Amino acid sequence: MSDTLTNTGRYQATFAKLKAEGRGAFVPFVTLGDPSPELSLKIIDTLVQNGADALELGFPFSDPLADGPVIQGANLRSLAAGTTPTACFELLAQVRAKYPELPIGLLLYANLVFANGIDAFYAKAQQAGVDSVLIADVPVEESAPFSEAAKAHGIAPIFIAPPNADSETLALVSASGEGYTYLLSRAGVTGTDTKAGVPVEEILSKLKTFNAPPPLLGFGIAEPAQVTAAIKAGAAGAISGSAVVKIIETHQHDEAKLLATLGDFTRAMKAAT
């Protein structure tokens, strides 16, 4: 692994490779430690070995504002299994050691960052091999203290482009973000029940005009056709969270079935890119 392949470098290398192949990225989300730290690592292995181009990982948190019941369930299972922030950083370091070129992003809430001290949190994230951090409850307008700490530690700050954002917000997201842009397919909480269906072409063309980092479409991405549609509309790929976590919830007591089902789902979603 070259010394230069850090933070945004891993995203750039991944997007460049996919572009050369004429493909998009499939990026699954899971909560670290769900349903247990040990099984969590096997789940991540299964995702990567079956075609995940990058990972989006959450730290368990007991009051996730933006998350629907599926991801809240993941948070509670992980906490019940005793997963602490320290355990999360240890898991991240193991994943990084196994997959030196894989982009690894964190998606979490400001409280978890504050609890560590902002600078200390990003320092730990860097040591664990994290490439990017998205703080779900901090809008771009209020993000300066986090972004400055992120950049000081070579970590890409990720921002959400909401479906109802005006041009001013999209310009700010484009200028402030690194690595990739998290494009919401609809406002609200995460989940598979209301399918992603917002026409995103307009936002995608604006993001392109503002030279934003590559946009990944998230929220409600649960089936291969949605991945294909996102990429066709101009996204660099798609993020799927609740659909992945739902598989973990359903098969949490049957490890073999869980990993097999997750492998099949990941292969099908990746094939759609």
UniProtKB/Swiss-Prot annotation:
Its EC number is 4.2.1.20. GO terms for molecular function: tryptophan synthase activity. Keywords: Amino-acid biosynthesis, Aromatic amino acid biosynthesis, Lyase, Tryptophan biosynthesis. One of its GO terms (cellular component) is cytosol. It catalyses: (1S,2R)-1-C-(indol-3-yl)glycerol 3-phosphate + L-serine = D-glyceraldehyde 3-phosphate + L-tryptophan + H2O. Gene3D superfamilies: Aldolase class I. It comes from the Bacteria. SUPFAM superfamilies: Ribulose-phoshate binding barrel. The alpha subunit is responsible for the aldol cleavage of indoleglycerol phosphate to indole and glyceraldehyde 3-phosphate. Tetramer of two alpha and two beta chains. Belongs to the TrpA family. This is Tryptophan synthase alpha chain. The gene is trpA.
